[in-house]
């Protein structure tokens, strides 16, 4: 299972930001509906709420979601690509960013080149879904949707997962709402202390069978 969790890193071709030192990774504006919503509600993401979320597309069709890790790098699931980028027509692979819907044809596109258990304040999953009223295969009419989940303890998680490593956390929808159990792996080690975190957001890997739809993030 560990091998399936290995991420695929895609390099972005283009100009880096002029002043990257002024950009604080993991920070975004506060949104009023991020803390009090019931766990089972799915809502369209507001503009700027998930600035790290992108759409990886093949021949202008949505392939998989991804998260910006760096101004040159995007993280996505390796199983989204049945072949390596060396075997693919790379010119047809693009990353769409800066939008929450695909109906905007002016969205920015970038060409792709070849120990101690921590409790998070919030845990959200984001998914690209087809807009109501459109065909599910119409990839130009999709929007970003979010779902809040709750973290469960390692002891409870271990009852469901046989090979639960120390760098994994588990979360699921609120009990009684037909929630799906998730296993998440942080993309980087947790910070040393809560005081240094503030309101940073961290990207998590999704357990393989679910990761084609959802990209998770947590806020401390």
From Swiss-Prot:
Membrane-traversing stretches: none
Pfam families per the UniProt record, alphabetical: Trypsin (PF00089)
Glycosylation sites: 33, 92
Disulphide-bridged cysteine pairs: 64-80, 157-170
Gene that encodes the chain: PRSS51
Extent of the signal sequence: 1-16
Recorded family membership: Belongs to the peptidase S1 family.
Domain of life, source organism: Eukaryota
Example of a GO cellular component annotation carried by this entry: extracellular region
GO biological process: proteolysis
InterPro entries xref list: Peptidase_S1_PA, Peptidase_S1_PA_chymotrypsin, Trypsin_dom, TRYPSIN_HIS
Annotated Peptidase S1 domain residues: 23-220
Keywords, comma-separated and alphabetical: Disulfide bond, Glycoprotein, Secreted, Signal
Subcellular localization, as worded in the UniProt entry: Secreted
One annotated GO molecular function: serine-type endopeptidase activity
Main location: secreted
Protein name, per record: Serine protease-like protein 51
């Amino acid at each position: 299972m560990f091998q399936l969790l290995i991420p695929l890193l895609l390099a972005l071709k283009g100009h880096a930001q002029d002043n990257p030192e002024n950009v604080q990774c993991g920070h975004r504006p506060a949104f009023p509906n991020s803390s009090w919503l019931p766990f089972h509600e799915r809502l369209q993401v507001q503009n700027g709420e998930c600035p790290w979320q992108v759409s990886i597309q093949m021949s202008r069709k949505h392939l998989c979601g991804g998260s910006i890790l760096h101004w040159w790098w995007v993280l996505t699931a390796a199983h989204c690509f049945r072949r390596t980028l060396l075997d693919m027509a790379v010119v047809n692979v693009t990353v769409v960013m800066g939008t929450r819907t695909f109906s905007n044809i002016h969205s920015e596109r970038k060409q792709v080149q070849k120990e101690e258990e921590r409790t998070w304040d919030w845990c959200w999953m984001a998914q690209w879904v087809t807009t109501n009223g459109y065909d599910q295969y119409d990839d130009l009419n999709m929007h970003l949707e979010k779902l809040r989940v709750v973290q469960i303890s390692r002891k409870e998680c271990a009852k469901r997962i046989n090979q639960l490593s120390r760098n994994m956390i588990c979360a699921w929808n609120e009990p009684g709402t037909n929630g799906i159990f998730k296993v998440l792996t942080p993309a980087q080690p947790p910070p040393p202390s809560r005081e240094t975190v503030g309101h940073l957001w961290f990207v998590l890997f999704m357990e393989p069978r679910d990761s084609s739809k959802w990209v998770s993030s947590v806020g401390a």
